[in-house]
Structure formats: C-alpha cells, structure tokens
C-alpha cells in the first residue's frame, strides 16, 4: 500500500548524488506516487476516488439522438407581432388589402398560440391554432386560415 505523505523538501543541502532520495532508483519512475496518471484508481487509489471523484467510473445519463429532438414549432401571437416588420423587410410576409399575410407553415411553424398582444390586422396561414390565438387575431382585424392536414 502506498504511504501518503508530503513530498520531500526541495531545499537541497549540498550537492549530493541522490539529493536526499536515498538510493538512485527511489526518485526515478513513478513508484513513489503510485503510478502515472489514473493508474490504480480501481485499486490502491480507491479511497481518493470515493472522496474526490465519486462519478469517475460508470456511465451517467445519455445523449438523446438529434433525430428525435423536436424543434421549436410553435409561435405565440406576441412573438408574431414582434417579427412582422422583419418578415416584411425580408420578403417573407406580404402586404395585401391592408393586411399583412404570413404563411407560418412555410416558416416552419406548426401551431399558433395565444400568448401576447397584437394590434395590426394580419392574415395568418398555419396548420393549427388555439382558440385564444384565433380570437386575438380576429379582434385585431385579421383572420386565421387553418391548413387541412394530409392523411
């Protein structure tokens, strides 16, 4: 068993052959510290592992495959109102008959949710929308066109 003790003093008292390390081999290699690196973690350094690195061994959790991670496919009415100007500049939304027309399905959104406020008349084309979202859009003078899902 390795004896845990402080390293010897670095004060060299006189120029000697071994500088306070006894026989020549005693300061050579890695025997005095119990091995290089992580050697002995499951053996003679186990008490160190238990105290300072309890999660050193074993598997912890998992990485979910990205194919199953759902992308953010909902948008709130408030977010929609904030993004309208940028979408008009980019050409994603159009101005028709005094209303801004936005196709959320083409932008990758699957559902319109009712959180937030909207004051401008908007025609929104979307696969699904909540009752509250439809009510808020209609109160602002707009309309919601819900696409029929295939299948």
UniProtKB/Swiss-Prot annotation:
Keywords linked to the UniProt accession: Ribonucleoprotein, Ribosomal protein, RNA-binding, rRNA-binding
GO CC aspect terms: cytosolic large ribosomal subunit
Disulfide bond sites: none
Biological process annotations from GO: translation
An example molecular function term from Gene Ontology annotations: rRNA binding
Keyword Ribosomal protein: yes
Subunit structure: Part of the 50S ribosomal subunit.
Membership in a protein family: Belongs to the universal ribosomal protein uL15 family.
Role: Binds to the 23S rRNA.
Protein name: Large ribosomal subunit protein uL15
Organism: Hyperthermus butylicus (strain DSM 5456 / JCM 9403 / PLM1-5)
